[in-house]
């Protein structure tokens, strides 16, 4: 009898053991149905356990096997196990998070796809029934969809519907990757580009390349030649992008030149389409995949090249509890599959530039000397100006000047200083304030606490108003209401567009035109830093950054790097209007050395200075840091848990004569949700291998104590 190790879709850092009956044939990476407590759930077989004496073991039996082959490729399987060990994240959560939704249930990969024909359509008078029947006729349904709609059983019994045909996902009429591909448009490459392409593909092994600061025309020619060479060898290509808007831009461009099957992957696909594309990739029926984060985990049949567009972007960083960077996973996958990877960015991350210095990554350059273009910017000192709703009088005058010229204006707000929920009394109108900094307390709609963003104080939500003693306290959205009303007063007869949320995008059809802001007449577009990057503004000639002080006074040492990347990529939001674009920056600290050099310095000159500063103060990428996060219902327990880890690490480092630096533990808001509070402990070490080893030992010791069961914790490794 075989014992199998199984992972379940639960946030638990361990696997479970089950007996496998002799009649079943288990497969590593395949799904099985196992009993867990009072119900049956789907698990994934990780490995087999060899034990001679199994008579003393009290293990449950596996109910059934679902798959006859592994649903993960060998490379993806090894990457997922490495992720769980490196980031100390629950292994079951990782394995199930990358699967299509249908495969998380008891659903076969070769699931049937039914269509229906209407019978006796003249004999019923109910208009709703008639509409439902036509809905069934137009669409095709998977087996699992039939369970959702209860009216199917009724219609089939009454002979209103008949199953007319059934198709399998594997037998779709799709051109196979091994068929001869066609080129729609011919293109010619110069000797320099051909030489670089041959250099990349000649070795047939893992190499990492950075392409930056090059002419757009030459870059396009280079990518066309590289993709053509890969397709001629019957290889699949993965193109990673940070935003959905970039997918449709690249798709439109590739379809002009290549007549091959191209799939797009993003979070807004429905479950059925996502599963179809996952199966097509596994069986090798598509040639190119353009996708966002999760497409890096797709089970490619024969992957030959990975391209990471805008490799510096923060959108690649996962802000859940498993805080990996998709760029790093793509590099690891290329290394394991022995294929080249291209990192593309006009403002590459400091980590990539550090790898170039140490010859871990190679630099692609087509032109020796390219003229650098400097953006026209003006820095406004907020201390010397009259301010209305965060806008200075100079900025307001400049906005009116641009509107008189019939140009649209883009205002980029700092989200966390404008938009928040507060507690207000309906009767007297009093707003709850912090007693230390006199700023407004913030809250959530369904939370029972008030907190101050500046002082990191958290208190219980009062039951009544302390001013009028009335039980009429309500949660009110101060930011958006306040901004809209104030802007309408200052700019009364001007069109205002508020792009403050992405929720409306999901209801609309995704096309390349949707992401372009089409209005060319005078208007003011108000948005935030994060949301502005999801759109193109081709007619904008003036951009204003209303407040950038949070970058220069952030506790995160990478904040200046992120600001520089955002600033130098503003030109990408407006398209071809480089010379006409003006940028105004509002700040209370205009003498900051980084702001003073923005007009005259290149991005790479800034990077040299920042890298030398980090080397001087022993910061990553020269040294290594890990942040331990913990949260609990009781803040004292999460603080004690981190103190225990700190004591264990200090004792072990003294024993090994290695210096570790600690900051904390202290309270902090999470990166994804600023309303959620954690305790964090920062650990600094000169050696990555030693830090990894000592963390493993300390975590094993801490898990012996009962306090670890009352605390949720996770690690943030490779902070850069």
From Swiss-Prot:
One of its GO terms (cellular component) is primosome complex. Zn(2+) 2 binds at residues 434, 437, 452, 455. The keyword Nucleotide-binding applies. GO terms for molecular function: 3'-5' DNA helicase activity; ATP binding; ATP hydrolysis activity; DNA binding; zinc ion binding. Transmembrane segments: none annotated. Residues 200-366 form the Helicase ATP-binding domain. PANTHER family: PRIMOSOMAL PROTEIN N. It catalyses: Couples ATP hydrolysis with the unwinding of duplex DNA by translocating in the 3'-5' direction; ATP + H2O = ADP + phosphate + H(+). Zn(2+) 1 binds at residues 425, 428, 465, 468. It is an enzyme of class 5 (isomerase). This is Replication restart protein PriA. Signal peptide: none annotated. PROSITE patterns: HELICASE_ATP_BIND_1. ATP binds at residues 213-220. It comes from the Bacteria. Binds 2 zinc ions per subunit.
């Amino acid at each position: 009898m075989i014992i199998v190790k199984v992972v379940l879709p639960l946030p638990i850092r361990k696997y479970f053991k089950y007996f496998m009956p002799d009649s079943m044939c288990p497969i590593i990476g395949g799904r099985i149905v196992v009993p867990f407590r009072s119900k049956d759930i789907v698990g994934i077989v990780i490995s087999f356990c060899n034990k001679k004496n199994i008579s003393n073991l009290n293990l449950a039996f596996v109910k059934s096997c679902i798959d006859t082959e592994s649903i993960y490729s060998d490379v993806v399987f090894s990457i997922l196990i490495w992720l769980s060990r490196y980031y100390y994240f629950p292994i079951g959560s990782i394995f199930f998070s990358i699967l299509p939704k249908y495969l998380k249930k008891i659903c076969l990969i070769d699931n049937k796809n039914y269509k229906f024909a209407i019978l006796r359509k003249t004999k019923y008078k109910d208009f709703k029934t008639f509409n439902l029947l036509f809905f069934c006729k137009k669409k095709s349904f998977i087996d699992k969809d039939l369970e959702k709609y209860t009216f199917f059983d009724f219609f089939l019994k009454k002979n209103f519907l008949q199953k007319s045909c059934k198709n399998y996902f594997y037998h779709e009429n799709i051109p196979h990757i091994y068929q001869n591909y066609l080129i729609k448009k011919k293109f010619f490459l110069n000797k320099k580009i051909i030489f670089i392409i041959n250099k990349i593909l000649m070795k047939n092994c893992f190499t990492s390349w950075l392409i930056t600061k090059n002419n757009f025309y030459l870059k396009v020619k280079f990518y066309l030649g590289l993709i053509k060479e890969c397709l001629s060898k019957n290889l699949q290509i993965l193109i990673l992008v940070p935003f959905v808007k970039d997918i449709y831009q690249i798709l439109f461009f590739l379809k002009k030149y290549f007549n091959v099957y191209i799939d797009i992957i993003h979070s807004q696909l429905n479950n059925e389409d996502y599963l179809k594309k996952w199966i097509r990739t596994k069986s090798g029926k598509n040639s190119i995949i353009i996708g966002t984060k999760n497409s890096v985990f797709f089970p490619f049949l024969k992957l030959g090249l990975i391209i990471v567009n805008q490799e510096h972007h923060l959108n690649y960083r996962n802000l859940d509890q498993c805080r990996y960077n998709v760029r790093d996973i793509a590099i690891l996958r290329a290394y394991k599959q022995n294929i080249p990877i291209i990192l593309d960015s006009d403002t590459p991350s400091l980590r990539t530039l550090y790898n170039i210095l140490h010859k871990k990554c190679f630099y692609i350059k087509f032109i020796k000397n390219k003229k650098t273009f400097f953006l026209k910017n003006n820095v406004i000192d907020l201390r010397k100006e009259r301010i209305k709703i965060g806008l200075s009088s100079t900025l307001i005058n400049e906005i009116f000047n641009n509107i008189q010229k019939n140009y649209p204006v883009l205002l980029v707000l700092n989200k966390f200083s404008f938009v928040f929920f507060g507690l207000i009394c309906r009767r007297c109108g009093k707003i709850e304030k912090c007693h230390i900094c006199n700023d407004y307390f913030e809250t959530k709609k369904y939370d029972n606490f008030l907190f101050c963003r500046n002082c990191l104080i958290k208190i219980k939500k009062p039951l009544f108003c302390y001013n009028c003693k009335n039980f009429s306290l309500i949660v009110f959205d101060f930011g958006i209401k306040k901004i809209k009303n104030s802007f309408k007063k200052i700019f009364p007869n001007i069109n205002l567009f508020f792009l403050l949320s992405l929720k409306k995008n999901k209801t609309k059809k995704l096309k390349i035109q949707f992401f372009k802001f089409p209005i060319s007449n005078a208007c003011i577009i108000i948005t935030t830093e994060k949301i502005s990057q999801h759109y193109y503004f081709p007619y904008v000639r003036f951009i204003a950054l209303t407040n950038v002080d949070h970058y220069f006074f952030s506790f995160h040492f990478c904040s200046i790097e992120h600001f520089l990347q955002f600033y130098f990529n503003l030109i990408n939001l407006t398209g071809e209007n480089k010379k006409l674009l003006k940028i105004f920056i509002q700040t209370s600290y205009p003498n900051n050395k980084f702001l003073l050099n923005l007009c005259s310095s290149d991005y790479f000159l800034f990077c040299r200075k920042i890298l030398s500063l980090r080397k001087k103060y022993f910061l990553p990428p020269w040294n290594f840091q890990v942040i331990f996060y913990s949260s609990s219902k009781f803040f004292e327990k999460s603080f004690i848990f981190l103190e225990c880890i700190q004591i264990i690490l200090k004792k072990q480092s003294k024993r090994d004569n290695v210096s570790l630096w600690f900051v904390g533990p202290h309270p902090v808001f999470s990166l994804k949700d600023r309303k959620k509070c954690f305790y964090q402990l920062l650990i600094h070490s000169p050696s990555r291998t030693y830090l990894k080893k000592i963390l493993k030992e300390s975590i094993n010791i801490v898990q012996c104590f009962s306090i670890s069961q009352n605390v949720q914790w996770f690690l943030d490794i490779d902070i850069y």
